[in-house]
A protein has these predicted regions:
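Structural microenvironment flanking redox-active thiols in thiol-disulfide oxidoreductases
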Residues: 106-150, 157-167, 200
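Short, hydrophobic alpha-helical segments
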Residues: 202-210
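Short active-site neighborhood of thiol/selenol oxidoreductases, capturing the structured segment around
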Residues: 83-106, 126
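Thiol/disulfide oxidoreductase modules built on the thioredoxin-like
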Residues: 148-153, 158-203
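Loop/turn elements at helix/coil->beta-strand transitions in domains of secreted/extracellular proteins
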Residues: 89-93, 121-125, 151-154, 181
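A short beta-strand-turn-helix
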Residues: 71-93, 119
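N-terminal targeting signals for export/organelle localization
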Residues: 2-71, 211
Length: 211
């Protein structure tokens, strides 16, 4: 027959064992939750970099590499009557895919506006293609107010159904295309940055003779 002291020891040992098991279970749950959180953050960060591309990447197209720029899909136009790229042959066209809720786009905007001011009279046409990220950005009147508030003077066209976005195979905001006087895509930049190179490309295309 067990003594009271022995029973007390058994209870204490059993309680200690249960405590250790519970702690191990909690630790395991914590590790699993931590792994899930890290994986989710990693995915979200990768997705953000893919869509917003803050560090930027550029590509130049020459000769046979250059393709004719797809026509802009029909949408609501702000600051202009509807524009057709075919009607802009003989001018260099800068097409920027953006959305007013994108902070990367807002960081890029002062440069795009300055190029419009500096080179419009020299043969550059800037067109903003507004491809919304969120549902509320599809409201045309809201977009009109944002365009006015941001001091954008160049034409902006809505792309709420992403037809133009898909035609140009855009992956993120902002994305800039430079189209030469023959209507061919000659340069592309995704994300922020590389503004000096963008301006050099504009100057180079403006200097080219129309063939």
């Amino acid at each position: 027959m067990s003594e009271p002291g022995e029973l007390s020891c058994v209870r204490i040992c059993k309680q200690a064992e249960e405590t250790i098991v519970a702690r191990r279970q909690n630790l395991l749950i914590g590790v699993v939750v931590g792994i899930v959180v890290v994986a989710a953050l990693t995915y979200a960060t990768g997705l953000s970099k893919q869509l917003l591309a803050p560090f930027g990447s550029s590509a130049e197209y020459k000769g046979s590499e250059s393709a004719t720029a797809p026509e802009l899909a029909t949408g609501e136009w702000i600051n202009s009557e509807p524009v057709k790229l075919n009607d802009l042959r003989g001018r260099v066209v800068l097409i920027e895919f953006w959305t007013f809720g994108c902070y990367n786009c807002r960081n890029t905007l002062p440069f795009v506006k300055s190029w419009d001011d500096r080179y419009r009279a020299k043969g550059l046409t800037v067109i903003g293609v507004h491809s919304p990220e969120f549902e509320e950005e599809k409201n045309v009147e809201h977009l009109r107010r944002e365009v006015a508030s941001l001091g954008i003077r160049y034409p902006v066209v809505t792309d709420n159904d992403y037809q133009t976005w898909n035609a140009y195979k855009v992956k993120g905001w902002p994305t800039v295309f430079l189209v030469d006087k023959q209507g061919r895509i000659r340069w592309k930049h995704v994300g922020e940055g590389n503004y000096d190179e963008a301006e050099r490309q504009i100057q180079k295309l403006l200097a080219e003779k129309e063939s």
